From Swiss-Prot:
Keyword Protein biosynthesis among record annotations: no
Gene3D superfamilies: Polymerase Basic Protein 2, C-terminal domain (3.30.30.90)
Gene name of the record: PB2
HAMAP family with a match to the protein in the record: INV_PB2 (MF_04062)
Subunit details: Influenza RNA polymerase is composed of three subunits: PB1, PB2 and PA. Interacts (via N-terminus) with PB1 (via C-terminus). Interacts with nucleoprotein NP (via N-terminus). Interacts (via N-terminus) with host MAVS (via N-terminus); this interaction inhibits host innate immune response.
Protein name as annotated: Polymerase basic protein 2
Annotated family: Belongs to the influenza viruses PB2 family.
GO cellular component, one term: host cell nucleus
């Protein structure tokens, strides 16, 4: 009450009223701004004001027993006043200094482990090199970038489970650690953090930095991998840039880079196989990148490169809703269109069937080295604003936009026939035909486009058909801008479908991606990519195909051998022999195949002529569709090391060399593995291998029922007898052995006994 009376008294004096009304503080909005809510409105001022006080910091009461009242200089370190509203004491900033110098020492062993990302950053900066500063206009475009080097790629939910398990292992709550990476990380971190005294909350924060990819939408000119983004403030300003080479690489950037290379290789390879989608899936599932399964990386990695997105679509994952054309990512920002088929005539009077987009639409186009805004109507380019690093990049963007516009003058600019094919030798679709044509040479396109006078607009300039800049004239509708076009910021993902030929469509049926969009750029992966699929054997050239094919036969010899005798056609059709065919001269493939198949048939017919080494050596040649001919060969040619080399049908050669004493096979001097059995003895009858574990009793005995196939033998109980069909229709009586110990001798005796039983 007293206070209120006092205030009323003050207000009655005209001077008080004048001060309060003439100064801006009486603005209710301002008073509200600085007094409402818990959020500090002017942190730096508050900090300066607090630090000017004698005791701006509060501490636990126990501190008074651990710190002297005064330091060596006699300055007071803590106040006897307790903090209003809590049972803490007020201390001076000098107390912190004293504590840091004289306080108790704790073990520092866990710091580098917990603050790993910071320690690594310091190392990278220490070893990084900063080059000269250049002053120039920076074309920055906002891109979604990774701001957190050195992280694993767990989803937020997966990381949360790992953190809870590591930091609060005894807390209640359902945590299911399923993925390989979750389990590995949890185990590793639990071991690292035994007896760790750092506060659990801090540990949790730091683990989050290590486990989850953090992205921001930032203006960037130049490198976008996380080791460049962490020094963005040092390397590029509004009008300057500083050259920088990072002092180390981080696994997350390496994973991104290697994933793109693996995905491109796989999509390119799948596109030329008989069933692209099935092949692509088979390869994704059997490939490892840096020791991690590629499918696991695809599930977690947000990279939006075309080949990566095709692989994700094949796995049924959601992908970005933007589409790709000519290496640019298009995102429709307004308008809409309907599609209908239309036939058009090129300048060479060739008829093309194109899907025309009818309606007004606006797009952003973002490429590696150029960006643009495109406004178009039905088969008409209204406006194109391009920005890019150099003339070449700008030209690329203009060509793509002109083709995409489907304008008649573009189609009429075609000279000559359009017959571009993809890797599988199939004709490209009309839009990609046009694109390839003008990417090769755009002179006629630019000349025929037409030019116009331009108004002087800030930051925009015209461009002539020969790509020179101009302030007076420009190609119709085309302008070059100093400012870049931002990448589409939304990270939304949509459900898509993918067809057999790897064309990815959204739910409206618009094609978002196709193998034609996958870059042909080759690179060297940072992490080891292990392709287990036979389709990828050829990636390292003919020699690798040769070695891998023979290694595969040797590794799977037990099954191959049985198929060779019982179901050769199925064996010849195995996809593992597909890559080998590219090494055999096309003209003679069929004859070789016919010759080898006949030879094999004779081996099956004539008991005892089974020769393991020869079967292994010649088997890949039998995979081609056979041509019947009377031709005999003593050697077969394969194209490796830039020329034809010969494999001898009988005997060793530099390509195929089997050492009988060591039982080792070398292909072109490279070790291809060991054969488990000696080709001369145990395998002279293929049945010997199959009849291991059975005793041959003699000729067929009808009392034991109809003859079983070799496959059906496995169902017999120990001691049970049965007739079995072997080789070429001969039937013998066998009994399943009661003991396993004597199995080894079966192979040797089987051959002799089969002969006796048959004769």
């Amino acid at each position: 009450m007293e206070r209120i009376k006092e205030l009323r008294n003050l207000m009655s004096q005209s001077r008080t009223r004048e001060i309060l009304t003439k100064t801006t503080v009486d603005h209710m909005a301002i008073i509200k701004k600085y007094t409402s809510g818990r959020q500090e409105k002017n942190p730096s001022l508050r900090m300066k004001w607090m630090m000017a006080m004698k005791y701006p910091i509060t501490a636990d009461k126990r501190i008074t027993e651990m710190i002297p009242e005064r330091n060596e200089q006699g300055q007071t370190l803590w106040s006897k006043m307790s903090d209003a509203g809590s049972d803490r004491v007020m201390v001076s900033p000098l107390a912190v200094t004293w504590w840091n110098r004289n306080g108790p020492m704790t073990s520092t062993v866990h710091y580098p482990k917990i603050y790993k990302t910071y320690f690594e950053k310091v190392e990278r900066l220490k070893h990084g090199t900063f080059g000269p500063v250049h002053f120039r206009n920076q074309v920055k475009i906002r891109r979604r970038v990774d701001i957190n080097p050195g992280h694993a790629d767990l989803s937020a939910k997966e990381a949360q489970d790992v953190i809870m398990e590591v930091v609060f292992p005894n807390e209640v709550g359902a945590r299911i650690l399923t993925s390989e990476s979750q389990l590995t990380i949890t185990k590793e971190k639990k071991e690292e953090l035994q007896d760790c005294k750092i506060s659990p909350l801090m540990v949790a924060y730091m683990l989050e930095r290590e486990l989850v990819r953090k992205t921001r939408f930032l203006p960037v000119a130049g490198g976008t991998s996380s080791v460049y983004i962490e020094v963005l403030h040092l390397t590029q300003g509004t009008c300057w840039e500083q050259m920088y080479t990072p002092g180390g690489e981080v696994r997350n950037d390496d994973v991104d880079q290697s994933l793109i290379i693996a995905a491109r290789n796989i999509v390119r390879r799948a596109a030329v196989s008989a069933d692209p989608l099935a092949s692509l899936l088979e390869m994704c599932h059997s490939t490892q990148i840096g020791g991690t399964r590629m499918v696991d990386i695809l599930r977690q990695n947000p990279t939006e490169e075309q080949a990566v997105e095709i692989c994700k679509a094949a796995m049924g994952l959601r992908i970005s809703s933007s589409f790709s054309f000519g290496g640019f990512t298009f995102k429709r920002t307004s308008g809409s269109s309907v599609k209908r088929e239309e036939e058009v005539l090129t300048g060479n009077l060739q008829t093309l069937k194109i899907r025309v987009h009818e309606g007004y639409e606006e797009f952003t186009m973002v490429g590696k080295r150029a960006t643009a805004i495109l406004r178009k109507a039905t088969r008409r380019l209204i406006q194109l604003i391009v920005s890019g690093r150099d003339e070449q990049s700008i030209a690329e963007a203009i060509i793509v936009a002109m083709v995409f516009s489907q304008e008649d003058c573009m189609i009429k600019a075609v000279r000559g026939d359009l017959n571009f094919v993809n890797r599988a030798n199939q004709r490209l679709n009309p839009m990609h035909q046009l694109l390839r044509h003008f990417q090769k040479d755009a002179k006629v396109l630019f000349q025929n486009w037409g030019i116009e006078h331009i108004d002087n607009v800030m930051g925009m300039i015209g461009v002539l058909p020969d790509m020179t800049p101009s302030t007076e004239m420009s190609m119709r509708g085309v302008r070059v801008s100093k400012m870049g076009v931002d990448e589409y910021s939304s990270a939304e993902r949509v459900v898509v479908s993918i067809d057999r030929f790897l064309r990815v469509r959204d739910q409206r049926g618009n094609v978002l991606l196709s193998p034609e969009e996958v870059s042909e750029t080759q690179g060297t992966e940072k992490l080891t990519i292990t392709y287990s699929s036979s389709m990828m054997w050829e990636i390292n050239g003919p020699e690798s195909v040769l070695v891998n094919t023979y290694q595969w036969i040797i590794r799977n010899w037990e099954t191959v051998k049985i198929q060779w005798s019982q179901n050769p056609t199925m064996l010849y059709n195995k996809m593992e022999f597909e890559p080998f065919q590219s090494l055999v001269p096309k003209a003679i493939r069929g004859q070789y195949s016919g010759f080898v198949r006949t030879l094999f048939q004779q081996m099956r017919d004539v008991l005892g002529t089974f020769d393991t080494t020869q079967i292994i050596k010649l088997l890949p040649f039998a995979a081609a569709p056979p041509k019947q001919s009377r031709m005999q060969f003593s050697s077969l040619t394969v194209n490796v090391r830039g020329s034809g080399m010969r494999i001898l049908v009988r005997g060793n050669s530099p390509i195929f060399n089997y050492n009988k004493t060591t039982k080792r096979l070398t292909i072109l001097g490279k070790d291809a593995g060991t054969l488990t059995e000696d080709p001369d003895e145990g395998t002279s009858g293929v049945e010997s291998a199959v009849l291991r574990g059975f005793l041959i009793l003699g000729k067929e005995d009808r009392r034991y029922g109809p003859a079983l196939s070799i496959n059906e033998l496995s169902n017999l109980a120990k001691g049970e007898k049965a007739n079995v069909l072997i080789g070429q229709g001969d039937v013998v009586l066998v009994m399943k052995r009661k003991r396993n110990s004597s199995i080894l001798t079966d192979s040797q005796t089987a051959t002799k006994r089969i002969r006796m039983a048959i004769n």
